[in-house]
A protein has these predicted regions:
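Conserved Nudix-box catalytic region and its N-terminal flanking loop in Nudix hydrolases
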Residues: 2-4, 11-14, 49-52, 56-101, ...
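Nudix hydrolase/Nudix homology domain
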Residues: 2-17, 42, 80, 91, ...
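Acidic, metal-coordinating catalytic segment for phosphate/diphosphate chemistry
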Residues: 15-59, 63
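Conserved hydrophobic/aromatic beta-strand scaffold that supports enzyme active sites
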Residues: 31-35, 59, 69, 138-140, ...
Length: 197
């Protein structure tokens, strides 16, 4: 059977939210308990996370076409992971500017100029739509130059690494890099012809 992306006639019916209770909240997220009616009219309690902001991530290249990655300990998985600079956009902040701000704060790097050739929107991914409304918008930036000192959050202990595109693709392929934003950024770049396979 061939499925056409424009044909949604066989999509499942959405759930109806009858009530929502905030079970926990801090500055980063809310844990919500939804009382929902399923398409067959059964009631169900569903736990979901709602983020405090919209995520942004930036995959940056220098003039030698090397890629800037970070290594940071992530307590959720109890590992040091490969990732791109990123964070949360502030309320009403332009997402591209939020990505560039996070890049500068975490690394001290910025593009030499902000043009359509040096800053490119790659796409948006859901972080985990099974239980969360959180998403991340991904940008690629070329011609990075060191522009200033880092201004990291107090809990950010990050090392910076310049890697080749070949190393990056192999690290994604082999599973050494597992971060969703890095994997998605590489896929977007390859699919749009912005990185050679």
């Amino acid at each position: 059977m061939t499925i056409h992306s424009s044909d949604h006639s066989s999509d499942p019916a959405p759930w109806q939210t009858l009530a929502t209770h905030v079970a926990f909240q801090n500055r980063w997220l809310q844990v919500l308990l939804d009382d929902v009616a399923l398409p067959d009219n059964r009631r169900y309690e569903y736990t979901r996370l709602q983020g405090a902001g919209i995520g942004v991530g930036v995959l940056g290249f220098n003039a030698n076409s090397e890629v800037l990655l970070e290594r940071e300990y992530r307590h959720g998985v109890n590992q040091v992971v490969w990732q791109v600079p990123g964070g949360l956009a502030k309320a009403d902040e332009d997402l591209q500017l939020a990505g560039l701000r996070e890049l500068a704060e975490e690394t001290g790097y910025a593009p030499a100029a902000i043009t359509p050739e040096t800053v490119r929107y790659l796409g948006m991914i859901w972080d985990n739509p099974g239980f969360s409304s959180m998403c991340s918008h991904i940008y690629a930036v070329w011609n990075l130059t060191l522009t200033g000192k880092t201004q990291r959050d107090p809990a950010e202990f990050v090392t910076l690494h310049w890697v080749t595109p070949a190393w990056l693709k192999e690290a994604v392929r082999s599973g050494e890099i597992k971060d969703r934003v890095v994997v998605a950024a590489v896929a977007y770049l390859l699919l749009n012809g912005l990185m050679k396979a």
